[in-house]
Amino acid sequence: MSKQPSLSYKDAGVDIDAGEALVERIKGVAKRTARPEVMGGLGGFGALCEIPAGYKQPVLVSGTDGVGTKLRLALNLNKHDSIGQDLVAMCVNDLVVCGAEPLFFLDYYATGKLNVDVAATVVTGIGAGCELAGCSLVGGETAEMPGMYEGEDYDLAGFCVGVVEKADIIDGSKVVTGDALIALPSSGPHSNGYSLIRKILEVSGTDIDNTQLDGKPLADLLMAPTRIYVKPLLQLIKQTGAVKAMAHITGGGLLDNIPRVLPKNAQAVVDVASWQRPVVFDFLQEKGNVDEHEMHRVLNCGVGMVICVAQDQVENALNVLRAEGEQPWVIGRIDVAAEGAAQVELHNLKAH
């Protein structure tokens, strides 16, 4: 008999019992998000989902994303309750821009050492995000990988599938000169630009724990969960049929995201003076001495979603969005793009 001690998975840094405890704690979270099309519960090898009734030519739409280095801020602040909503928002907001209704969501949670309380808090936030989006949390993967991550540090990824009627896909092809652009406000930086944000905080020596802006802690402003626009936008599409294009304003800001949904000959003219930029963006710009153009290329600057409709549908669209609890405004219009011109032109940029 060998004198070497008998090694277990736990000795290697993987606690199977902790993983099982987490699954038990999150079953209720998944149950609260259940849609009637989902077949079976958590724990199977694969999640089954029917196509919802009523679709003639259903097209499945998929997307995957993470939350970038906002996660590092969450870890530093030990604030894990809203990062799950961020994860869901980054995926479902991308799906809805083509008119898709999110059906189901899966998450991937990887860590060096599984902290069941932290993981359960994160997944509870994912569940809350799924409820806001009307999609079902059908499964996920929790990977405890000692040696890959420092201690209880973790990384997140999300994956979502939605469905849209083939004839109703929104792809920007109907956008024409004279169309109007409507904006929906963001809650803050959402889940993009956090490497720049963290660099600004570091270089400026900002004490994030003891800084307030307009009476609100800076930490809360930076960790505000990404808004989920799915339900108001699906209502807008359903009630008006007027949406020609939508852009989720993520990494790349207005400058890089609006062109993704425009025809090649179209230019979006955006009036930067049409909204009051949230104070957190002005604070970051000042502390980091960030160029105005760079601000709009990295951060959303207060705009989370841009919607294109015909000029004669503007009031109708604004009314529907307001009835859904949104605070929309007209942010610009569509012009013809001159040869070689950028597809987004920002008017009334402030001097910096």
UniProtKB/Swiss-Prot annotation:
It catalyses: 2-formamido-N(1)-(5-O-phospho-beta-D-ribosyl)acetamidine + ATP = 5-amino-1-(5-phospho-beta-D-ribosyl)imidazole + ADP + phosphate + H(+). GO terms for molecular function: ATP binding; phosphoribosylamine-glycine ligase activity; phosphoribosylformylglycinamidine cyclo-ligase activity. The keyword Magnesium does not apply. GO terms for cellular component: cytosol. Its EC number is 6.3.3.1. Keywords: ATP-binding, Cytoplasm, Ligase, Nucleotide-binding, Purine biosynthesis. It comes from the Bacteria. One of its GO terms (biological process) is adenine biosynthetic process. It is an enzyme of class 6 (ligase). Pfam families: AIRS, AIRS_C. Pathway: Purine metabolism; IMP biosynthesis via de novo pathway; 5-amino-1-(5-phospho-D-ribosyl)imidazole from N(2)-formyl-N(1)-(5-phospho-D-ribosyl)glycinamide: step 2/2. It is found in: Cytoplasm. Belongs to the AIR synthase family. This is Phosphoribosylformylglycinamidine cyclo-ligase. It comes from Pseudomonas entomophila (strain L48). The gene is purM.
